[in-house]
UniProtKB/Swiss-Prot annotation:
Disordered: annotated span: 1-37
Post-translational modification remark: The N-terminus is blocked.
Name of this chain's protein: Major pollen allergen Ole e 10
Higher taxonomy: Eukaryota, Viridiplantae, Streptophyta, Embryophyta, Tracheophyta
Tissue: Expressed in mature and germinating pollen.
Cited function: Carbohydrate-binding protein binding preferentially 1,3-beta-glucans. May be involved in pollen tube wall re-formation during germination.
N-terminal signal peptide: 1-21
Disulfide bonds: 38-101
Native source species: Olea europaea
Length: 123
């Protein structure tokens, strides 16, 4: 009902802006001492892992020298070992965001250092 002069009797509510809730996904920044690495999932096939190696090693700024013959991470000379190095290098260089370890569902985050022998993985 309107009062005199066409003014509403009750105040008109104003819309409030939508505010993201705490359930919105927000990547957590890496913290000192909280080291993580990206490695292949156990069920990833050699073909999928070779595709990951090919992709990472074709990108500008990525150094795949360590997984080439005579490189510090060439041995063990397996697709899985080479993919571990390449996938982790990508993950670390892109800021350690979990989504940078997806690799079409073939990557997994671990807190166990995959380095071995003379091969040191970035962390």
């Amino acid at each position: 009902m309107r009062g005199t002069a066409g003014v509403p009797d009750q105040p008109v509510p104003t819309p409030t802006p939508s505010v993201p809730t705490s359930s919105s996904p927000v990547p957590k920044p890496p913290t000192q001492g909280n080291k993580k690495w990206c490695v292949p999932k156990a069920e990833a096939t050699d073909a999928q892992l070779q595709s990951n190696i090919d992709y990472v090693c074709s990108q500008s700024g990525m150094d795949c020298g360590p997984i080439q013959a005579n490189g510090a991470c060439f041995n063990p000379n397996t697709v899985r070992a080479h993919a571990s190095y390449a996938m982790n290098s990508w993950y670390q260089s892109k800021g350690r965001n979990d989504f940078d370890c997806d690799f079409s569902g073939t990557g997994a985050i671990t807190s166990s250092d995959p380095s071995n022998g003379s091969c040191s993985f970035l962390s």
